[in-house]
């Protein structure tokens, strides 16, 4: 499976993953809206939006 792994608004980069899902976490801090992407579907703290998906590069 191929997932995107760039941070926030960086140019798109991808990684090959052993997991069968990709995630996109979104939250806000003093620098504005932050976005993290990667493999799997992690647990997140309250206040963090998590989207998980199951197709290649679906978390862009």
Curated annotation (Swiss-Prot):
Chief place of localization: secreted
GO cellular component: extracellular region
Keyword Magnesium carried by entry: no
MF GO annotations: acetylcholine receptor inhibitor activity; ion channel regulator activity; toxin activity
Protein origin, superkingdom: Eukaryota
InterPro entries listed in its UniProt record: Snake_3FTx, Snake_toxin-like_sf, Snake_toxin_con_site, Toxin_cobra-type
Function: Binds to muscle nicotinic acetylcholine receptor (nAChR) and inhibit acetylcholine from binding to the receptor, thereby impairing neuromuscular transmission.
Membership in a protein family: Belongs to the three-finger toxin family. Short-chain subfamily. Type I alpha-neurotoxin sub-subfamily.
Protein's UniProt name: Short neurotoxin 1
């Amino acid at each position: 499976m191929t997932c995107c792994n760039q941070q926030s608004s960086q140019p798109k980069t991808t990684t090959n993953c052993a997991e069968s899902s990709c995630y996109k976490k979104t939250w806000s801090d003093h620098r504005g809206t932050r976005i993290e992407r990667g493999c799997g579907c992690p647990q997140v703290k309250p206040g963090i939006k998590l989207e998980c998906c199951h197709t290649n590069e679906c978390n862009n």
